[in-house]
A protein has these predicted regions:
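Multi-pass membrane glycosyltransferase architecture that uses lipid-linked
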Residues: 1-22, 31-33, 42, 47-255
Length: 255
């Protein structure tokens, strides 16, 4: 489908294949900010419109790295309590592999904290965590009925935890949540669709309202709605946490 859409525009291009890659590359490079008016993790960290090359300070990557070790510690504790082989669960189970992924992220964050962590180094690592988690869940739950829900949760994870994100980037996920419910009958996906619809609507409404009132240069998540902005950020983080549970247990509703 993507090729059919791109092909008509490729005929007159000097580089029939490379032009689309360059277009996306140039577009992404123009968004060199931690977040762009999005009620997500980075807005809570006061990084709205913060240049990606700016340093985050050491506290953020160290704190995140410590939190990323918790799944591994929980797995080890569970193995000791149940007298199960740790390496088998670590390498062969979904939760074990995700725990290992988090541990790798933790080591990376400790290293960049020591040498100087920028928003780009931090944000791309969080993006890799989201992609890795969803891919592992897809591998362990390969039934096609789960795919729309996984894709929606991937977009939600990127929306909340990745850099270079606009407030409108979650729109496709809302339709995928609904499609995921139709395919899997998991009502949790409906709750996620409703929750993210509310936060995204309010987020976008604030930005558009400010653009109309003050012009495009001031059409942002400004301090005059700071309390609401923070509430939306917290709600999105809570929704993502709920979404992580859905992602890890896609067959829960059928149990």
């Amino acid at each position: 489908v993507a090729a059919a859409i791109i092909l008509p525009f490729s005929v007159e291009q000097e580089h029939p294949i490379g032009w689309i890659i360059k277009l996306y590359s140039d577009t992404l490079s123009s968004y060199a900010y931690a977040t762009l008016n999005t009620a997500n993790w980075y807005y809570l960290l006061s990084a709205n419109w913060a240049q990606l090359t700016l340093l985050t300070g050491r506290a953020l990557p160290i704190a995140t790295g410590c939190c990323a070790l918790l799944p591994l510690l929980a797995l080890a504790t569970s193995c000791i309590r149940k007298k199960q082989p740790f390496l088998v669960r670590l390498l062969r189970t979904q939760n074990g592999q995700i725990s290992l992924l988090c541990a790798v992220l933790s080591v990376y964050l400790f290293v960049v904290a020591a040498v100087g962590c920028t928003w780009s180094l931090y944000g791309y690592a969080m993006m890799a965590l989201v992609y890795g988690t969803v891919i592992l869940c897809c591998l362990h739950h390969s039934d096609a009925k789960h795919l729309p829900g996984f894709l929606a949760l991937l977009l939600a994870g990127i929306y909340v935890l990745a850099v270079k994100v606009h407030e409108r980037y979650l729109f496709p996920a809302l339709g995928l949540f609904l499609l995921g419910y139709v395919c899997s009958r998991d009502r949790r996906l409906l709750w996620l669709m409703i929750g993210f619809s509310v936060t995204t609507f309010l987020n976008t409404a604030i930005v558009l309202d400010n653009s109309i009132l003050y012009g495009s240069s001031l059409g942002h998540l400004n301090d005059d709605t700071l309390a609401l902005n923070v509430i939306l950020c917290v709600l999105n983080l809570l929704l993502l946490g709920f979404g992580a549970w859905v992602c890890l247990t896609p067959d829960w509703s059928a149990a």
